[in-house]
Amino acid sequence: MAPQTEQKIYVGIGLDFETGGLDCRECACTQIALQAVRFDTWQVFDRYQAYIAPYGKQDAGLPRRKVLRTRHEQAKGQEYVPMKYEQAALDYSAITMEMLRTQGMDMKKVAGEVIAFAKRATLSKGNQCKPVLVGQNIAFDIGFLQQLVNYAGLAAEFEKTFSGSRDYYGNFQPH
């Protein structure tokens, strides 16, 4: 009798961000929406949505590359600098700063919930069964997702949870 093998279930997570602008190095995330879809049945089995409260810029969200800085630049990097929220981007998404202040969740909490969502969406064991990210212009959304998890200090957990590989600079790139 042949050994029984468990059929693998592959999952895609539809990712969509609303943002304060187009540059993930300068602009903030304002809203995230996720949708988990089984690739065998095309069934949507989980959803997540959250507004993200305003937060400050951090070096942790930038790609790791060697950058020479003067002492003055290093000292200046210690102060709070708010992320950009361009009015055109807010108008396009119909999100206001008041909405973000009153309904927005802490960025670190949102990042943790995104990783928890992906763990729930992993329906089979094995590295090849980790969820893949899907969406329209997904490279744009991935940049903001990386900013979110890096700022929250969850980059290692992000790498364990999603399917992906490392680029030339050693940065994890999900696929």
Summary of predicted features, one role per range:
Residues M1-Q4:
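Glycine- and charge-rich intrinsically disordered segments
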Residues E6-G12, C27-T30, A36-E98, Q103-H175:
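Metal-dependent phosphoesterase core characteristic of DEDDh/y 3'-5' exonuclease domains
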